[in-house]
A protein has these predicted regions:
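Strongly charged
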Residues: 1-109
Length: 109
């Protein structure tokens, strides 16, 4: 599995926009900070929809008074909290559902 970092995204943006890396990096940082800020300020839930990419959603979880620690088998209480969820767009879903043989000949621009 390949791991892509923010630096890789900055490179792609710089290449796509035909600008130097040091000019593209603040743009990527600003987008990431805007997404993170929106999620962290969610009261208590929010939904960030990015067309042709997907939806980030902050959801509330219920408290689990009888959860179990898998290592010790001890019964523990897990309080209600928020979590993030990502739902890919139809475009991404269709791409990911392609048979692997077809993907070998497909390159994303």
């Amino acid at each position: 599995m390949i791991t892509y970092t923010k630096r890789d995204i900055v490179r792609r943006v710089a290449e796509s926009m035909d600008v130097p890396l040091n000019q593209a990096e603040p743009w990527v940082d600003t987008i990431i900070e805007a997404l993170r800020g929106t999620i962290m300020e969610a009261d208590p839930t929010c939904r960030i929809e990015l067309r042709d990419f997907g939806v980030f959603e902050v959801k509330e979880t219920k408290a689990k008074p009888k959860a179990r620690n898998p290592k010790t088998n001890e019964v523990i209480y897990v309080p209600a909290h928020r979590k993030t969820h990502f739902k890919p767009s139809k475009l991404l879903k269709e791409f990911l559902r392609q048979p692997l043989e077809e993907l070998e000949n497909h390159k994303v621009d």
